[in-house]
């Protein structure tokens, strides 16, 4: 009888310890990255941050909004990170959105954008809308 009680106690202790040691998945969050820099260091940083945010919780939602010279990250022939952008789009909850005004000002055609990059009417307006909707804000730059 003592043996049965000891075994039962040990089983309960193991179950409680295992449940206690499991850390709950953090609640998903939404973050908008504001990219206006053509600097490759900044572009690499945003790719790294996307992967880190995704690693915390795969349900986290992200958006990179590019305007000004930030468009270089997703323009064929100007970016050295095309495969990293494609991988991020394919394997994380991230959208890459470019500003239509910046495209017009820089004479960039939609055909020059990497696949699956989306166009928004106004980059600044997009960032503000995300902030108003409760998204976290990260300015990409150094």
Residue ranges and their predicted role:
Residues 1-8:
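Bacterial N-terminal signal peptides that target proteins for export
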Residues 8-16:
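Bacterial N-terminal signal peptides
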Residues 19-142:
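Secreted/extracellular ectodomain signature
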């Amino acid at each position: 009888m003592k043996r049965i009680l000891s075994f039962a106690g040990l089983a309960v202790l193991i179950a409680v310890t295992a449940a206690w040691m499991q850390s709950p998945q953090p609640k998903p969050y939404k973050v908008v990255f504001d990219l206006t820099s053509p600097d490759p260091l900044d572009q690499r940083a945003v790719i790294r941050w996307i992967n880190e945010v995704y690693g915390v919780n795969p349900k986290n939602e992200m958006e990179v909004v590019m305007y000004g010279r930030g468009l270089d990250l997703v323009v064929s022939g100007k970016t050295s990170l095309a495969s990293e952008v494609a991988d991020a789009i394919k394997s994380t909850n991230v959208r890459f959105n470019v500003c239509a005004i910046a495209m017009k000002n820089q004479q960039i055609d939609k055909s020059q954008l990497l696949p699956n990059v989306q166009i928004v009417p106004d980059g600044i307006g997009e960032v503000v809308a995300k902030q108003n909707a409760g998204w976290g804000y990260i300015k990409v730059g150094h």
